From Swiss-Prot:
Belongs to the ferrochelatase family. It is an enzyme of class 4 (lyase). It catalyses: heme b + 2 H(+) = protoporphyrin IX + Fe(2+). This is Ferrochelatase. Pathway: Porphyrin-containing compound metabolism; protoheme biosynthesis; protoheme from protoporphyrin-IX: step 1/1. The keyword Plastid does not apply. HAMAP family: Ferrochelatase. Its main location: cytoplasm. The lineage of its organism: Bacteria, Pseudomonadati, Pseudomonadota, Gammaproteobacteria, Pseudomonadales. It comes from Pseudomonas aeruginosa (strain UCBPP-PA14).
Length: 340
């Protein structure tokens, strides 16, 4: 039987915390038209301006969370790759990053050289966005066309509402929910509003809605924010969370454009003003801990919350290589994958 490789796809990381490595990574990331959706000349100008100061600032942030083994995202993704092998009996399990190493191109060429003819992609993004899911899949298409690879490729679609994914989230978070706390904040990665408006053409679609109940199926399929709300609502129901004891926010905004709300930094101050002293934060848009969780929330967010008057902020780890997540990912990749 022809082997079917499972290719885990995530965003990526600099090779090291050196400023030049961070600059190279940021340049590749920000020059992606799915990330900064401006015409090439404007994008090049904007990114060049960003790269004057941002690499040194980001290098400092990466240094604060870097492990002896390397980038936390890469290390944790490698652990997931290893843990997945017993759950994917159809062929090898490989890992690639959209930016940085291991590059999608290198991994696909290696699979082709080894005689692999079937590949199942597993983009590790629960919710859909052009800047994550689409760009990863488009890079796979580009590599296959550029090298004329004879690969039959299928891909795991976004799984924001899949019961096995939600159950894995609940199981991984449950020990933290059993600790004394006042509130749970689900902080998702943010996105410029225009990224959603380009895809969801319905002018009545509400990007400030507090829940996903009235979202049409057509809008839900394309609206990252609505999918995040759907994940949060389903998680809260499964975890038995009381209304008012949890909320949703969006982090990591960049630049002056309007991003989806509410913003996490503003939400942290609001929760303190509401009397929340002990805060739990989970980041369900990420399946592996990275700079956005460990540094932005676990360090800067915690410092902000305590400085504003809170007593403690506990960052709940991402799914990483939790056994429930490993099993869920294997099951979904086999059951849900569709032709690319």
């Amino acid at each position: 039987m022809t082997e079917n490789a499972l290719l885990l796809l995530n965003l990526g990381s600099p090779d090291s915390t050196r400023v030049e490595d961070v600059r190279r990574y940021l340049d590749q990331f920000l020059m992606d038209p799915y990330v900064v959706d401006l015409p090439w000349p404007l994008r090049r100008l904007l990114v060049s301006l960003i790269l004057i100061k941002r690499p040194a600032e980001s290098a400092h942030a990466y240094s604060s969370i870097w492990w002896d083994e390397g980038s936390p995202l890469i290390v944790l993704s490698r652990r997931l790759q290893e843990a997945m092998k017993p759950h994917w009996p159809h062929g090898p399990v490989e890992l690639a990053m959209r930016y940085g190493q291991p590059a999608i191109e290198k991994v696909l060429l290696d699979l082709a050289r080894r005689g692999i003819r079937r590949v199942t992609l597993a983009p590790l993004y629960p919710q859909f966005a052009d800047s994550t899911t689409t760009t990863a899949e488009q890079e796979v298409r580009r590599v296959i066309a550029a090298h004329r690879l004879e690969l039959e490729v299928s891909t795991l679609p976004p799984f924001y509402d899949q019961p096995v994914y939600l159950d894995a989230l609940v199981e991984s978070v449950r020990p933290y929910l059993q600790q004394p706390h006042d509130h749970l904040l689900l902080s998702f990665h943010g996105l410029p509003e225009r990224h959603i408006r380009k895809l969801v053409k319905d002018p009545a679609h509400d990007l400030l809605a507090e829940n996903s109940r009235n979202v049409s199926p057509e809008a839900l399929a394309l609206c990252y924010r609505s999918q995040c709300l759907r994940t949060a609502e389903a998680f809260a129901e499964r975890a038995g969370l009381e209304q008012g004891r949890w909320s949703v926010s969006f982090q990591s905004r960049l630049g002056r454009a309007k991003w989806i709300e509410p913003y996490t930094d503003a939400k942290l101050d609001e929760l303190v003003q509401r009397g929340v002293k002990r805060l739990l934060v989970m980041c369900p848009a990420f399946v592996a801990d990275c700079i956005e969780t460990l540094e932005e929330i676990g360090m800067r967010g915690r410092e902000q919350f305590i400085s504003a008057g809170g007593e403690d902020l506990v960052l709940i780890p991402c799914l990483n290589d939790h056994p429930a997540w490993v099993g869920a990912l294997g099951e979904m990749s086999g059951r849900l994958a569709r032709p690319l």
